[in-house]
Swiss-Prot record:
CDD domains: SIMIBI. Essential for the replication of all genomic viral ssDNA (trans-replication). The closed circular ssDNA genome is first converted to a superhelical dsDNA. Rep binds a specific hairpin at the genome origin of replication. Introduces an endonucleolytic nick within the conserved sequence 5'-A[GT]TATTAC-3' in the intergenic region of the genome, thereby initiating the rolling circle replication (RCR). Following cleavage, binds covalently to the 5'-phosphate of DNA as a tyrosyl ester. The cleavage gives rise to a free 3'-OH that serves as a primer for the cellular DNA polymerase. A divalent metal cation binds at residues 33, 41, 84. Keywords: ATP-binding, Covalent protein-DNA linkage, DNA replication, DNA-binding, Endonuclease, Helicase, Host nucleus, Hydrolase, Metal-binding, Multifunctional enzyme, Nuclease, Nucleotide-binding, Nucleotidyltransferase, Transferase. Belongs to the nanoviridea/circoviridae replication-associated protein family. Residues 2-96 form the CRESS-DNA virus Rep endonuclease domain. One of its GO terms (cellular component) is host cell nucleus. Homooligomer (Potential). Rep binds to repeated DNA motifs (iterons). It holds the Pfam family Viral_Rep. This is Master replication protein. InterPro entries: CRESS_DNA_REP (IPR049912), Helicase_SF3_ssDNA/RNA_vir (IPR000605). Its EC number is 2.7.7.-, 3.1.21.-, 3.6.1.-. One of its GO terms (molecular function) is DNA binding.
């Protein structure tokens, strides 16, 4: 039996008193029954507000035989309301509310339908939360990402059409450099559009090892470089991506090899002279 449980089944043989509602209980149902051997007993199902230990439950239900609920909520409730063995009852306390089954698939489906946070399953689905909370938080992050991306709006201009036309003709050497010196030309907005509609990786720059680690074989790599990072842009990393061989030595050595990557730089500045050969950069002015 799990050490701490929310949902319990209980049986009290030859009861002298009947269970009463407590502040710790969210929902309870029971009835007085007569078993096959004629023993008078209380058969009940209880959902606690918090996970409780067997010791705690014995304090709440003295003399009861207690077990963790094994079936569904509805099955447990119905079992305590069956007519063929009933003497008195059934008696219900609190509000019965169906929650999703305590397994990863159903919890993820419920998250998608209700938009609940993972923490909200701590008590209703404790086993899934304990075993798979990291997965639930990743699902939540992906849901939040999808929601944010669906809210993005795109406005196109002449230069975005030029970029699309360039990408329509793959070239293993070419790096597309989108130059807009004033800001507000829509470079980041277009980067968002590519992330939303294409298999695109986005980076505002940073340490090369971190960028290599985050890259997950996307078809398009976008470097949206803010003005303050002009002096820190790693031009060699751009060539690594364009060459299709990206290496990271962070945590453990990683070598990523891809057939073709479209590299796009969005910047308020031009590339430094002498860094690239003339055929390497395709300049697009905003």
């Amino acid at each position: 039996m799990a050490r701490y449980v929310v949902c319990w089944m209980f049986t009290i043989n030859n009861p002298t008193t009947l269970p009463v509602m407590r502040d710790e209980i969210k929902y309870m149902v029971y009835q007085v029954e007569r078993g096959q051997e004629g023993t008078r007993h209380v058969q009940g199902y209880v959902e606690m507000k918090r996970r409780s230990s067997l010791k705690q439950m014995r304090g709440f239900f003295p003399g009861a035989h207690l077990e963790k609920r094994k079936g569904s909520q509805e099955e447990a409730r119905s079992y305590c309301m069956k007519e063929d063995t009933r003497i008195e009852g059934p008696f219900e306390f609190g509000s019965f509310k169906l929650s999703c089954n305590d397994n990863l698939f159903d919890v993820i489906q419920d998250m998608r339908e209700t938009h609940k946070r993972p923490l909200e399953y701590l008590y209703d689905c404790p086993n899934t939360f304990d075993r798979s909370k990291d997965t639930l938080y990743r699902v939540q992050a992906e849901m939040n990402k999808t929601k944010a991306m669906n809210s993005w709006r795109t406005s196109f201009s002449a230069w975005t059409s030029e970029v699309e036309n360039i990408m329509a003709q793959p070239c293993h050497r070419r790096i597309i450099w989108v130059y807009g010196p004033n800001g507000g030309e829509g470079k980041t907005t277009y980067a968002k559009h590519l992330m939303k509609t294409r298999n695109a990786f986005y980076s505002p720059g940073g340490k090369s090892l971190d960028i290599c680690r985050l890259y997950n074989y996307e078809d398009i790599v976008i470097f949206d470089i803010p003005r303050c990072k002009e002096d820190y842009l790693n031009y060699g990393l751009l060539e690594e991506f364009k060459n299709g061989i990206i290496q990271s030595g962070k945590y453990e050595p990683v070598l990523k090899i891809v057939e073709y990557v479209e590299v796009i730089v969005m910047a308020n500045f031009l590339p430094k002279e002498g860094i690239f050969s003339e055929d390497r950069i395709k300049l697009v002015s905003c």
